Amino acid sequence: MTKKPQAKDHIFAKNMLPGDFIFDEKVAGVFEDMINRSVPGYSTIIAMIGVLAERYYQKDSIIYDLGCSLGGATFSVFERLKDQGCSIVAIDNSIAMLKRLVTKQQKFEGAHYCIESRCENIQVAQIENASVVILNFTLQFVPLADRAALIERVFKGMNSGGVLIISEKIISPDNHLNELIIELYHQFKENMGYSKLEISQKRSALENVLIPETLDSHRARILQTGFSSFEVWFQSLNFASMVAIK
């Protein structure tokens, strides 16, 4: 499959009026470039989500990608499990994102049989008979007060032995180290071609929208919900991916 060049992310390249970050048509159009240049190790996370899904998938169960955006994790899982006739439900509340996912889906042979896309709020989406649930940089956008209820909803809809994969931007409980890691992260973004203006403006836009937590907060919530085990399997700077087993 020949890939078209990614549209370049220049959304925050010029001075803008303050406003919250939203997943609109403009963001969806450059999201693939944006996420790959903004999240260290993103391609590794996406590839390994497919590997984890293949390991924990249960025959005739359902795989959920909650907050699927353009379907990076969805298609990684599909490529691993397409020969098993898997059922993947990809959910997002951004129509602009889902339109592009559906277009991309047409390029994967057999994907229309396996992947169902839904424009829904993941906080009220029905989850049942799930062996794999993915929250790939999604939980961080859910209001803090609602996160425990969402994880509880996921847990109740999962089969025993199933896996929950959560990727998140995180913070350190140590203020000095937290500032150090943020500075290193901004240097990473500069190395990826973003200007100081772009970094500053995007940070301001995300300030009230993306609320990161510590790894200990994630661990406590997961174990309190009833998952039998939890581990961080990947971390680069202030981004981590975790697994929880029911």
Can you say where each PLM-predicted feature lies in the sequence?
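Class I SAM-dependent methyltransferase Rossmann-like catalytic core
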Residues: 16-21, 25-46
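Core SAM-dependent methyltransferase catalytic element
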Residues: 225-246
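Conserved alpha-helix/loop element of class I SAM-dependent methyltransferases that forms part
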Residues: 41-59
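A short glycine-rich, Lys/Arg-flanked "PGG" loop and its adjoining helix->strand segment in the class I
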Residues: 148-160
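C-terminal alpha-helical "lid/dimerization" subdomain adjacent to the S-adenosyl-L-methionine
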Residues: 170-221
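Class I SAM-dependent methyltransferase SAM/SAH-binding core
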Residues: 62-65, 70-123
